[in-house]
Regions:
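Beta-propeller folds
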Residues: 1-301
Length: 301
């Protein structure tokens, strides 16, 4: 039995589908429908007599001064993103490991997002930072900080110096888009973004990854891999080896649940696919071996 629909029948099916307009995920009609469904759902939830108490408890838990300040360790410092009633947009801050072990750590502010939003007149929402320093280098960390104007998926990314606690003058900056990036070297970024008409998937995410050198215009970036418009998206990735080299690659999400992983061999023009299951995630490298977390059984060849 054929597993495809004859074109005439496919056209008839499309014509009879009353919800085909929802495929235009950014269209006014689809977004208006979503807003209506959200309002309907919220009204239903708020009608529950327990709603107010649950909401109050959730807000108190999320904004409690007693909650654990989870952090990331860099150069012997613990970095933490913190929000409270005073700092609604949040603080990026750091403290020493010794101070962090105390009941009341002494935090140093790295970046105040409320202050940044007020200074720049933007509704900035912090969406994370991708930081890098070459192994064995005395240089400080540089980070690509992702900022969303209003909390949407699209962000701008700006280079930030953790040593000076300032955005880098004439540093890397990407325009607003649904995008992803990874450091390939102190002066090289792997970028997936909106490269123009026809470069986004139906989900609105990029499917082309390029290599961008410092000082060069973004438009001159070298294409490394091109996925397909039917993918969920394609994003760059980089894994640091024990000798300091960077393993450059990309993650091509065929579906929401499955991903193909590629690496870009130095001196080669074509990417090479890693022979790992589509329901898995590379987590790092240890003693020359790739560490992979699995979401399905795997019997390596």
């Amino acid at each position: 039995m054929a597993d495809t629909i004859p074109s005439s029948h496919a056209s008839d099916a499309a014509a009879e589908d009353p919800y085909l307009w929802l495929e235009d995920v950014e269209g006014d009609a689809a977004l208006s429908w979503v807003r209506g469904q959200n309002e309907r759902s919220l009204a239903e939830l708020q009608a529950d007599p327990n709603y107010a108490a649950y909401e109050k408890a959730a807000v108190e838990a999320l904004t409690s001064a007693e909650r654990i300040p989870y952090g990331t360790i860099r150069e012997g410092m613990v970095y933490n993103f913190w929000q409270d009633d005073t700092h609604v947009r949040g603080l990026w801050r750091r403290t020493s490991l010794e101070s962090y072990a105390n009941d009341a750590p002494e935090w140093e502010i790295v970046l105040d997002f409320d202050q940044l939003a007020e200074t720049e007149g933007k509704n900035w929402v912090y969406k994370g930072a991708d930081c890098f320093r070459p192994k064995g280098s005395d240089a400080g960390y540089k980070c690509m900080v992702s900022l969303s104007n209003g909390g949407k998926d699209a962000v701008i990314r700006r280079e930030f110096d953790l040593s000076t606690k300032q955005f880098v003058e004439d540093g890397f900056v990407t325009p607003e888009a649904k995008q992803g990036g990874a450091w390939a070297s102190p002066d090289t970024l792997l970028i997936a973004t909106d490269w123009g008409e026809g470069t986004l998937t139906a989900s609105g995410y990029p499917f082309i990854v390029k290599r961008w050198e410092r000082g060069a215009p973004l438009e001159s970036a070298e294409e490394l891999i091109r996925g397909e418009a039917k993918d969920v998206g394609v994003w760059p990735m980089a894994l640091e080896l024990e000798d300091g080299r960077i393993l450059q690659g990309a993650a091509q999400a065929d579906t929401f649940f499955t991903t193909r992983y590629w690496w870009f061999p130095e001196g080669e023009t074509d990417p090479v696919r890693w022979p790992i299951p589509p329901k898995s995630s590379p987590e790092g490298v240890y003693q020359g071996q790739l560490l992979v977390s699995l979401q399905e059984d795997w019997a390596p060849a």
